[in-house]
Amino acid sequence: MSSVSASTERKHIKFTPIQSFVESSFFTKLSELKLDEFKLDSTKKEIKGFLTHPKRLNKFNDYPTINFDYSSFDKGPDVNEDNNISWKGYIYNVNTIEEFKDIDKQAILKRWGTEIYNEIQDGSVDLSYECFNKVHVLAFCDLKKYKFYYWFAFPTLHSPWNIIGADGDSLKKFIPSIKEFVETSKFVQFFQINDGNIIERVSEFQESKIFVFIDTCLSQACTPSVQLKNYLYVLARKGFENIDLIIYRNNGNSFYWKLQLDKDKLGINEVPRISGWERLSNGKLGPRLADLGSLIDPQELAKQAVDLNLKLMKWRIAPNLDLDIIKNQRVLLLGAGTLGSYVSRALMGWGVRNITFVDNGRISYSNPVRQPLFSFKDCFSDEGQGEWKAIRAANTLKEIFPDVQSKGYNLEVPMIGHPVNNETKQKSSFDKLSDLFDDHDVVFLLMDSRESRWLPTVLGLAKNKIVLNAALGFDSFLVMRHGNISNANNDDTRVGCYYCNDVVAPNDSLSDRTLDQMCTVTRPGVALMASSLAVELFISMLQHPNKQYAEPGPSNNLILGEVPHQIRGFLHNYSQSKLQTPNYKHCSACSKYVIDKFNELGWEFVKNCLNDVTYLEETCGLLKVQQEADLASSELLKDLELSDDDDSEWLD
């Protein structure tokens, strides 16, 4: 175009700023990535937003609005360009609010803008939409309070162009061809029209031809999107001084400008002024805050909060910790009293989601102070009686954390030494208990009598389940794991069970007991100690490469340290001992003889054992061991017998 005289009236170009629209799913995904993937890494990560395609704009698109949601972090294909245009960039998610505040915002914006400037200086980049339209977002996630601080920037380079005229008449003849190009071709935001041809390459631009900018907003004033700035700067750098420019809009409100560059104000060898930080609704510069605590479903908040502390372990302390294997465990707790209450709470703390209680007792007035899953009202709420422990414990867990899958069964476990007096009922209890073992991965034995643990011990080994045991004394406790049979290991190396040190089968220990013998008389803190150690032993076992087959002993290469066999604690001198005992081939609960007989006869074997402990001792070989011991004792005493003739010798 011909040059314009210096006396021509000039008018500065006004632009419509870009706005961001961030859906809550964007922050939900960001928090997930921060916990699981980014962790302490605050380097830039790719993101993308999407802008409504210019041919789809309507009266509500008075600002160019970039949308961000959960898909902004996807690394897959871009959005459908027929409806939306991808806008790519980076997120810088810092680790502290102080770091967010202390970052020099102007300096970092200049750095981002300089990246665009350097690409222009390089000269090898044409006016690609992706190159000249970048988004950057500075963010900080307060994951405990669900508050997200963020500030979007859309870097733009300034150049001193002025409006010196308009040409509405010439505009009309170009609109049809531009409209057809926008409607049918891949999106190009800035190009030149040369005899009806679309020219996209900067090297082919001619000053005498008309430039076209496809606007991404329909502002009522003639103020194009601020995206135009970067394209105008390219033209200024390439030596264009006077241009004709059409700002195309799909609603028929396009306009035609004649622009002139004030080249005296253009710094040839310096980075231009850079702007781009998004402003607040009041027009001031500043970051935004998204407080999702009141928007997210409380149950979802609880779910995320439970996982938060666990996932933070993986940031520095235990990066290889396998939380999924813990979360997916199905845990059966036999006993819903003091031990059951504390064990279940510790399991939930580790993220276990599936917990089942078995107990046959009701809540009494003495229970709530020691058993934290129960309260005073539970002692009389069932028609004057206490509620069933197992059922109430399961419901309490759901009240504490709604996402937990918790069930309770009022079930009496058949006990060795207690003869069968109602076979139908006890057989039903046995069948139900057997089914529960099938449906769970790990079993905790938390009952208050020795004989009640026998059948679960047998079932655990027969069904190859992880079994952990916790037992209390007045000022002592035992926590142990039972050994499991593995085809890969010699059974001789299997660690023992609760009964492996016994030379007699367990028997009735509940009959004819005084009150202090019937109640659990133990120092209150002992149960907490035993419960926590039992759960931690279980978690350490899951992190071991060999899981329940792990051999006891120290190791420096394990995620959570060693996996002992037994832990015995004593409060009278505040000591703990780690012990290891092998399985006993004549054990009344885990010996091969018992397991083989149980697998062969099932309930019939159990019934015979319940009715006659001698039958069990004969099956496992303990009876023969006892007889041999008696015989050896008799022989020893016989050797020590003195004849009358020897009396004088001994007396001398």
From Swiss-Prot:
Q: Which Pfam families match?
A: ATG7_N (PF16420), ThiF (PF00899)
Would I find Protein transport among this entry's keywords?
yes
The Swiss-Prot or TrEMBL record annotates one GO molecular function as: Atg12 activating enzyme activity
What is the protein's major site of localization?
A: cytoplasm
Which catalytic residues are annotated?
A: C519 (glycyl thioester intermediate)
Q: Which GO terms describe its cellular component?
A: cytosol; extrinsic component of phagophore assembly site membrane
Name its cellular compartments: Cytoplasm; Preautophagosomal structure
UniProt xrefs under InterPro entries: Atg7, Atg7_N, Atg7_N_1, Atg7_N_2, ThiF/MoeB/HesA, ThiF_NAD_FAD-bd, Ubiquitin-activating_enz
Q: Where is this motif: GXGXXG motif?
A: 335-340
- Quaternary data: Homodimer.
Instruction: Say what the protein does.
Output: E1-like activating enzyme involved in the 2 ubiquitin-like systems required for cytoplasm to vacuole transport (Cvt) and autophagy. Activates ATG12 for its conjugation with ATG5 and ATG8 for its conjugation with phosphatidylethanolamine. Both systems are needed for the ATG8 association to Cvt vesicles and autophagosomes membranes. Autophagy is essential for maintenance of amino acid levels and protein synthesis under nitrogen starvation.
Q: Which PANTHER family match?
A: UBIQUITIN-ACTIVATING ENZYME E1 (PTHR10953), UBIQUITIN-LIKE MODIFIER-ACTIVATING ENZYME ATG7 (PTHR10953:SF3)
Domain notes from UniProt: The GxGxxG motif is important for the function, possibly through binding with ATP.
Q: Which family does it belong to?
A: Belongs to the ATG7 family.
Name of the molecule in the record: Ubiquitin-like modifier-activating enzyme ATG7
Q: Can you name the source organism? A: Debaryomyces hansenii (strain ATCC 36239 / CBS 767 / BCRC 21394 / JCM 1990 / NBRC 0083 / IGC 2968)
Q: Which gene encodes it?
A: ATG7
